[in-house]
Regions:
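Short acidic/polar active-site loop segments enriched in Thr and Asp
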Residues: 89-90, 168, 187
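His/Asp/Glu-rich mid-to-C-terminal helical/loop segments that flank catalytic regions of hydrolases
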Residues: 198-232
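Active-site rim beta-loop-alpha module in soluble metabolic enzymes
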Residues: 127-164
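Non-catalytic positions within long, well-ordered alpha-helices that form the structural scaffold/packing
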Residues: 83-87, 163, 182
Length: 232
């Protein structure tokens, strides 16, 4: 890039945010960066792409690793350290999440105001609660997310427990990256794409999650494009 990247955006399961790059400059696999292993899960390409969005230098992380893949915190968060080495400031995490509130519908975008880890977990260097530095504006909703290790979707009992903790959505990512970013002195924001509702009985598959996320990608791109100037 001709300028150091100012913002990093992490694209979650099925979220295609390539439309943010008005002027793509390069794209490289995770494995091209120190300690970064290839992504293993469908819907996670496992690349870094550099370019500009509205004149703002940007790094797009396409996909991520997960705790349920059986890797430790250092391996899980190696992409965050790679982003820090590239010189990014803010890290904006996006993810697919299940809605825990009856008013949340698939395809809605939800700004994350706090993340609960469940079971309660504190990662190395984590500075207290996982509180984003910004609330991404113009989302359909705002609230607390819960992180769970996965890979199984939640049971009815687990859904009730998470609701009791005050969570309105649940996912299997973002929390480790936020913890690593904060430990590195990087500011954060997060948006969840609601891909299913846990309040209705339904048969849920990963393919369903990916399809709903893909359908919401263009709207998420537009939302993030408008918010980028605020991430300084």
């Amino acid at each position: 890039m001709t300028l150091p990247p100012r913002v990093a955006i992490v694209a979650g399961s099925g979220l295609d945010l390539g439309g943010l790059l008005d002027r793509p400059l390069w794209e490289k696999p995770f494995s091209a960066f120190e300690h970064c292993a290839p992504a293993q899960v469908a819907g996670h390409p496992g690349t870094f792409a550099a370019g500009e969005c509205g004149g703002i230098p940007l790094i797009l992380q396409r996909g991520r690793r997960h705790v349920y893949e059986g890797i430790g915190f250092d391996a899980l968060t190696a992409p965050v350290r790679a982003l820090a080495a590239m010189g990014v400031g803010p890290v904006v995490c996006t993810n697919a999440a299940g809605g825990l509130l009856p008013e949340l519908e698939p395809g809605q975008l939800r700004a994350v105001e706090r993340v609960i880890t469940w079971p309660c977990r504190r990662w190395p260097g984590q500075p207290g609660e996982l509180l984003p530095d910004w609330l991404v504006p113009a989302c359909d909703a705002t609230g607390v997310d819960a992180w769970v290790p996965g890979p199984s979707y939640e049971t009815r009992a687990e859904i009730g427990a998470l609701q009791g903790l005050g969570a309105g959505a649940v996912g299997m990512s973002t929390a480790p990256e936020m913890a690593a970013a904060r430990a590195l002195g990087l500011r954060t924001a997060a948006v969840s794409c609601i891909t299913n509702t846990c309040c209705r009985v339904q048969r849920l598959t990963h393919d369903h999650v990916l399809a709903t996320a893909r359908d919401a990608s263009a709207r998420l791109c537009a939302l993030l494009r408008n918010a980028l100037p605020d991430f300084r």
